[in-house]
């Protein structure tokens, strides 16, 4: 489905990604690693928000390296930001109908809101402005991606801001999304519960893919590397996530 060939990216004279080659066609793929390692940049390059300095991107065999965001979306790629964008003047129902396509109904829009734990009656006519919290916007953006039902969905830390909503519900949304699309879901996350549902894990550090393989092989290796210091940032975040879950 998605193939990255020797991807490199530089910004302001700094090398962010170096010779990244990946093939992604599994159900759930998690991307993790230290902060500043290049994870979000990798996701933005897949969506076309950033263009690689070198290398090629293939989607279903087509070279999409220099296609625009809209062109990639039309081919079946969607992206959910770590910090959702506010669209002043645009209502939730309009956003969801745009995401789902011209044949979308209000009923369908209400259904996807319910699936992400929001009461449709309270949110369907709301504007996407400062009256919505970050957590509410995050769930609306997840609902938008669910409504689109693309072949490849990319999520940048989808768990951020959803502390009042069951984490298990988020995982259920991903599973339901896959049932509908039979596509791939790429999730950037530090959460062990996200990593535990992944078919494969990509570990990105200092702009390089240091590890990539089945969860059963990669996750124990990452957790076991704590004493050597190679995975300190990851394990710190996993511990923080567990404490947050216990408080909830």
Give short role names for the model-derived ranges:
Residues 47:
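Helix-to-loop junction immediately C-terminal to a conserved catalytic motif
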Residues 55-62, 108:
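Conserved ABC transporter NBD signature motif
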Residues 83, 89-105:
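Q-loop/switch helix immediately C-terminal to the Walker
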Residues 154-158, 165:
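Walker B catalytic motif
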């Amino acid at each position: 489905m998605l193939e990255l060939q020797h991807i490199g990216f530089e910004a302001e004279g700094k090398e962010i990604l170096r010779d990244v080659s990946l093939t992604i066609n599994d159900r759930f793929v998690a991307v993790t690693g230290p902060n500043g390692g290049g994870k979000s940049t990798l996701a933005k390059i897949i969506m076309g928000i950033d263009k690689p300095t070198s290398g090629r991107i293939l989607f279903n065999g087509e070279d999409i390296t220099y296609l625009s965001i809209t062109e990639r979306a039309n081919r079946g790629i969607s992206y959910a930001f770590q910090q959702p964008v506010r669209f002043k003047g645009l209502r939730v129902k309009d956003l969801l109908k745009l995401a789902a396509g011209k044949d979308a109904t209000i009923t369908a829009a209400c259904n996807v809101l319910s699936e992400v734990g929001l009461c449709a009656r309270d949110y369907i006519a709301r504007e996407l402005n400062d009256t919505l919290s970050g957590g509410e916007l995050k769930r609306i953006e997840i609902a938008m991606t669910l409504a689109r039902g693309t072949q490849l969905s990319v999520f940048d830390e989808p768990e951020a801001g959803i502390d009042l909503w069951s984490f298990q519900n988020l995982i259920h949304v991903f599973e339901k999304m896959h049932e509908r699309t039979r596509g791939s879901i790429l999730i950037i996350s530090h959460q062990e519960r996200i990593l535990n549902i992944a078919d494969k894990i990509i570990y990105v550090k200092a702009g390089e893919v240091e590890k990539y393989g089945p969860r059963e092989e990669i996750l124990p290796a990452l957790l076991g590397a704590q004493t050597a210091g190679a995975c300190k940032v990851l394990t710190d975040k996993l511990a923080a996530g567990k404490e947050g879950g216990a408080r909830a």
